Curated annotation (Swiss-Prot):
HAMAP family, alphabetized: Ribosomal_bL35
UniProt cross-references to PROSITE patterns, sorted A to Z: RIBOSOMAL_L35 (PS00936)
Annotated Pfam families: Ribosomal_L35p
Upper classification of the organism: Bacteria, Bacillati, Bacillota, Bacilli, Bacillales
The protein's name in its UniProt record: Large ribosomal subunit protein bL35
Basic residues: compositionally biased ranges: 1-26, 38-48
Species name: Halalkalibacterium halodurans (strain ATCC BAA-125 / DSM 18197 / FERM 7344 / JCM 9153 / C-125) (Bacillus halodurans)
C-alpha cells in the first residue's frame, strides 16, 4: 500500500505545538487595513488554536507533521 500524502495546503497553514495542539493564524490579515480598527488589527496579529471540532480532520491531512 502506498504512503499517505501530506496535504500541502494544510501543512503551510498549521503548526503543531509542544502539547500536540494545532496553531493557526487568523484570516483577514493580508490587505485592506484602513477600514479595520486598531483593536481588530491587534487581535488578528496573535495566532489561535484550532477548535476540537476541526482538529481530527486537519490532523488526518497532516499525516507526518512533527
Amino acid at each position: 500500500m502506498p504512503k499517505m500524502k501530506t496535504h500541502k495546503g494544510a501543512a503551510k497553514r498549521f503548526k503543531k505545538t509542544g502539547s500536540g495542539k494545532l496553531k493557526r493564524s487568523h484570516a483577514f490579515t493580508s490587505h485592506l487595513f484602513a477600514n479595520k480598527s486598531q483593536k481588530q488589527k491587534r487581535k488578528l496579529r496573535k495566532s489561535a488554536i484550532v477548535h476540537s471540532g476541526d482538529f481530527k480532520r486537519i490532523r488526518e491531512m497532516l499525516t507526518y507533521k512533527k
